């Protein structure tokens, strides 16, 4: 099983969201969930939309943690996991870059992301 990460905008007047982009690495394994939550200090929930101004802060924290303290987070990676600290770094960087690319045309506080 894997997550599906998407970037969305909220449709005015109806409270619904429309996917506008997805990162290059948009389907990381569920096995990496504990590692992501730990390094980003973010207990994200599936099915919930998060404003990207907040998400970018958490992604930046996670990227720094994985770059400078990889061994601390490696222990959260399951033994039989397909992921690694390096691939986790690629995933978080991919999500951040996708958000920032959308923010070139849409204000960051108007963009949302979802881990599904």
Question: What are these model-predicted stretches?
Answer:
Residues 1-108, 112-116:
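Acidic (Asp/Glu-rich) sequence patches and key acidic residues
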């Amino acid at each position: 099983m894997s997550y599906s990460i998407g970037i969305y905008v909220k449709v005015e007047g109806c409270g619904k969201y429309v996917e506008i982009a997805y990162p290059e690495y948009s389907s990381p394994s569920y096995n990496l969930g504990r590692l992501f939550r730990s390094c980003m200090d973010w207990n994200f929930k599936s099915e919930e939309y998060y404003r990207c101004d907040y998400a970018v802060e958490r992604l930046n924290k996670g990227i720094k943690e994985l770059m400078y303290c990889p061994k601390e987070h490696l222990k959260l990676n399951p033994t039989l996991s397909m992921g690694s600290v390096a691939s986790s770094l690629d995933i978080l960087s991919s999500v951040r870059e996708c958000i920032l690319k959308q923010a070139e045309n849409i204000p960051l506080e108007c963009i949302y992301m979802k881990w599904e």
